[in-house]
Amino acid sequence: ATMDPITSAGFAFIALVGLPVVVLFLQVFVALRGDRGSEAVLLRARPRVAVLMPAHDEAEVIEQTLRRLIPQLAPGDRVLVVADNCTDNTAVLALSAGAQVVRRLDFERRGKSYALEFGVRHLALDAPEVVIVIDADCHVEPGAIDVLARECAARDRPVQSLYLMHSPEANGLPGQVAAFAWRVKNWVRPLGLRNLGFACQLMGTGTAFPWSAVQH
């Protein structure tokens, strides 16, 4: 039997469009089984943690973020804020809230990746066992640092926390739709991948790294 070009193109189009839909359906279906994480990991020894927080002109939010975060630290832990090309008083506020602060001024090399690299070089002077990257505008739920640290140390690989966006009611329907799409992308799909035994993407905040991975 032969297949004409039009039919072949039709099957190719269906496969191209249908495959992502099938993958998404599978991820959502498997995610419905819930979180199958093991609580045994939490019984492991608590590693020494450094929370690395890049911050560019975050004076409006950084104090609130640090007040929620610092009580979660254990003895030997620390928070390092990289005040990156700031034109406000981010550094002063972070220092008064109890964080260690380093200032970075380099207007040719801008961006989060440069700030993180700068912070890692500073941490290397007294290397922690686990580095957790948290953005300055994130709300860190109670207990999150401890769980991330233990998971990362036990598995000796990067670990991503649940990272959600909360849309103010004033944003109306478009904001609520965006928040729902964010939940599917950052919660449902990664949970499905986890239950299937696959890795999920790292999202740039709420991410823990073993020091052995960071230093390379």
Regions found by a protein language model. Give the residues of each.
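N-terminal membrane-anchoring/stem segments of glycan-assembly enzymes
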Residues: A1-L43
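Cell-envelope/extracellular polymer assembly enzymes that use nucleotide-activated donors
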Residues: P47-A50, R78
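Donor nucleotide-sugar binding loop of glycosyltransferases
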Residues: E58-V61, C86
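Acidic donor-binding/catalytic loop of UDP-sugar-dependent glycosyltransferases
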Residues: E63, N89, D135-E151
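Short, acidic, metal-binding catalytic loop of nucleotide-sugar glycosyltransferases
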Residues: R67-G76
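A conserved acidic beta->alpha catalytic loop
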Residues: A83-A91, D106-E108, C138-H139
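Long helical/loop segments within the catalytic core of UDP-sugar-dependent glycosyltransferases
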Residues: R103-P128, V147-H216
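Short aromatic/hydrophobic "clamp" motif used to bind/position activated sugar donors
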Residues: V131
